[in-house]
Amino acid sequence: MQNIIKSIEEEYYKKDLPRFGPGDTVKVHVKVVEGTRERLQVFEGTVIKIRGTGLSQTFTVRRTTSGVGVERTFPLHSPKIARIEVTRRGKVRRGRLYYLRQLTGKKARVKEKGRY
């Protein structure tokens, strides 16, 4: 039974995904349909959570816009996601960065990972 499910899911996996983790700053290009037009909307922020495996894997991106924190959760293999760009690698020691929700301003920054 598992082999059947795995073979069906195989065709829906995205192959061109970059490697990223919590603390990384990413740009997510999302396809948005407005009426009959389809355009790309860019959501840039810090990855605070990655959960799940396989097709159901999701990641949450947080950004602060004019003092208001906005979090968006994206399915990793969704056809609505055109592409994901990693702009910065963050150095963190946690898998879930929920503590960033209470921090504002410069305190909410994540250190950049060394280039070695």
Curated annotation (Swiss-Prot):
Instruction: Give the UniProt entry's GO cellular component terms.
Output: cytosolic large ribosomal subunit
One BP annotation, GO: translation
Please give the superkingdom of this protein's source.
Bacteria
One MF term in the entry's GO annotations: structural constituent of ribosome
Record keywords, A-Z: Ribonucleoprotein, Ribosomal protein
Family of the protein in this entry: Belongs to the bacterial ribosomal protein bL19 family.
PANTHER family from the UniProt entry: LARGE RIBOSOMAL SUBUNIT PROTEIN BL19M, RIBOSOMAL PROTEIN L19
NCBIfam families assigned = rplS_bact
Q: What does this protein do?
A: This protein is located at the 30S-50S ribosomal subunit interface and may play a role in the structure and function of the aminoacyl-tRNA binding site.
Q: What is this protein called?
A: Large ribosomal subunit protein bL19
Species source reads: Syntrophomonas wolfei subsp. wolfei (strain DSM 2245B / Goettingen)
Q: Which gene encodes it?
A: rplS
